[in-house]
Amino acid sequence: MKIVILASGTGTLLQSVIDNVDTTKIDILAVGSDRQCEALDRAERAGIPTFRVDYIPRATDRDQWNRDLADALAGYAPDLVVSAGFMRIIGAHVVERFAGKIINTHPALLPAFPGAHAVADAMAYGVRVTGTTVHIVDSGVDTGPILDQRPVTVRSDDTVETLHERIKETERALLVDVLHRIAELGISIEGRKARIGSHD
């Protein structure tokens, strides 16, 4: 399975994929970002090609940015696009060109606590259990069909930072596991239900 990974930050999730995927089954074609970041440095150190489509903050140009991102991804012809700490909303041009072929990780048990502040929102709500989700990317924000989830218990002495770090540890293991299963079994999607393989 050929994949392209999108990342925006320090790249710890990306590094977990680089370090742990079976390269005989999963080929990381490239790592892309919307900015210069440590994630790109990690990819370059691993000998993985990188590309940038710098984000355009003006609302009038976001449509063009999404077109440019879609074109950049299409140049690699990936079987799967993996959003791993990519801090931009993936727009319609990308979603339509890679329908059902983009996955994202999220630090909560969706559909609870979507958006950029999921960990803080979960703590503020007082939940006892949160977790991490891998889902198909659709045109909404963290609304796509769910592929897999893993729980993380909220401790009484947790801060947002300590909870987020434990979620990240779980997220790294989950993403690597999901990628291996997709490489072996593929993805099937029927409406809101996404499955790895024909049965899950």
Regions found by a protein language model. Give the residues of each.
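Membrane-interface segments of envelope glycosyltransferases acting on lipid-linked substrates or membrane lipids
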Residues: 1-4, 15, 57, 120-121, ...
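Donor/substrate-binding cores of folate-linked one-carbon enzymes
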Residues: 20, 84-197
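N-terminal glycine-rich "phosphate-gripper" loop used for MgATP/nucleotide binding
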Residues: 33-34, 62, 76-92
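N-terminal Rossmann-like dinucleotide-binding module
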Residues: 1-38
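Short, surface-exposed acidic-centric catalytic microdomains
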Residues: 24-67
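Hydrophobic beta-strand scaffold residues
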Residues: 28, 49-51, 80, 102, ...
